[in-house]
């Protein structure tokens, strides 16, 4: 099936990253500490990616680059094949990562002083992205369900916050970080 991706890769190979300027490992207090606070995977990069990087490095010039048409074509094709969604390449905005994308969204959709609603606890970079764009944080606390061992949305509180006259944007983290929960279709 075209939607099934088979990847043969060894995820059991341990790789020590201490002493490599690893933000995750070299800032840990001791060898007996397992740093689980950052989404920094401890698996070696897939060989196809390192080969592509070597090919680029072998060129020996690192000037400004543009995003090639093949990138946009691949994104459009993937979304159509995987989700049945069709859109044009002009609908895609390339960013260098999640945090710059969050900041760009806030900048595009809000004005200074607007409120941005989050459901906390949530990915820490949401907070600095909101502040750095001159907006005010409005945090709707998630409810921890001790029976189901998961976070749940407090819809009454969320509705109240979203109804505020200065609320302009809801930053939804899905899957939720740090809870790991994928919000259900009914919740969304």
What do these predicted regions represent?
Residues 62-188:
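Conserved core of the PLP fold type I
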Residues 8-97, 104:
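N-terminal small-domain helix-loop-helix segment of the aminotransferase-like
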């Amino acid at each position: 099936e075209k939607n099934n991706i088979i990847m043969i890769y060894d995820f059991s190979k341990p790789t020590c990253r201490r002493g490599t300027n690893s933000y995750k490992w070299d800032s840990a207090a001791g060898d007996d500490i397992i740093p689980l606070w950052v989404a920094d995977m401890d698996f070696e990069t897939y060989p196809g990616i390192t080969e592509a990087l070597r090919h680029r490095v072998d060129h020996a010039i690192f000037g400004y680059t543009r995003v090639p048409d093949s990138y946009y074509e691949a994104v459009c094709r993937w979304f159509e094949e995987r989700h049945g969604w069709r859109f044009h390449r002009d609908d895609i905005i390339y960013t260098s990562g999640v945090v710059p994308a969050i900041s760009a969204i806030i900048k595009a959709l809000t004005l200074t002083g607007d409120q941005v609603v989050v459901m906390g606890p949530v990915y820490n970079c949401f907070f600095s992205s909101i502040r750095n764009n001159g907006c005010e944080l409005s945090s709707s606390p998630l409810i921890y369900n001790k029976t189901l061992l998961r976070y749940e949305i407090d819809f009454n509180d969320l509705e109240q916050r979203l109804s505020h006259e200065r609320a302009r944007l809801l930053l939804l983290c899905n899957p939720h970080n740090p809870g790991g929960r994928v919000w259900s279709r009914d919740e969304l």
